[in-house]
Amino acid sequence: MEKAVSTTELTTSFGWDTRQAFEQQDVQELSRKLMERLEEKMKGTVAEKALPELFVGKTKTYISCINVDYESSRIEDFWDIQLNVRGNKTLEDSFRDYIQVETLEGENKYDAGPPYGLQDAKKGVIFESFPPVLHLHLKRFEYDLNALTMMKVNDRHVFPMEFDAAPYLSANADMSESWVYELHGVLVHSGSLDAGHYYAFLKPTKDGYWYRFDDDKVNRATEKEVLEENYGGEYEFANGTTGVRQPYTQKYSTKRSMNAYMLVYIRKTRSDDVLLPITKDDVPSHIGKTE
């Protein structure tokens, strides 16, 4: 009988002890720890640039004067993009919110220095490039000003199987090939801020099936299970229904407490390079053994 592979070696490499390994960890922080450790191990090897080439994109933060030819800007790398859920109904809404332009005028004019002085200006962020593998962090946990505490945002937020990232790129971006991305991973959080559980839906091949990975259980999944069941939002109730008991919290709620927390998209023009077939030689011998 086949057994699930132990994660002990992985968590030990993060410096976690047994107690930390069994605590609920934030999946975005875990992803960053994994990337950091892999980068450390790859330094000085032929694979040193492999991770940045796969996962790193670039943003430009800018302040551009409206009436004179002056712009202040800086280019920065990103490994993932944090997108607001609250106030945005779709993934496209969240991207538009991210690159929304602020106008600096009146008492809030921008000081462009000599010889221009105070100027009306546009301030914002735009993407210079997206990586072949794009990690999107949906901000499901936020500080609630009314409750004065961190709360989970269970609002409905729709994400597509495919989306075009071109509208969010700067005018100078390379448009020689398509910027359409296809969904290949959905990391779900079920529960509340204090009590919950993570599981994942993954499509490991270009044209294959979706699978649900939940602790040591792996099952085939439908597109409905991948998409609609993880948008969050209100349940559809029959008349008189007061709510549904939520897993982990055991409280009744009119909103789904299971919803997407991270999304993994792969650029379609690069999918053949990213999703290479995995052979037995690629799997370490001690992991490939079955009992």
Predicted regions located by residue number:
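Exposed substrate/partner-binding surface patches
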Residues: 1, 43-46, 69-291
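Papain-like cysteine protease catalytic cores
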Residues: 1-77, 113-116, 128
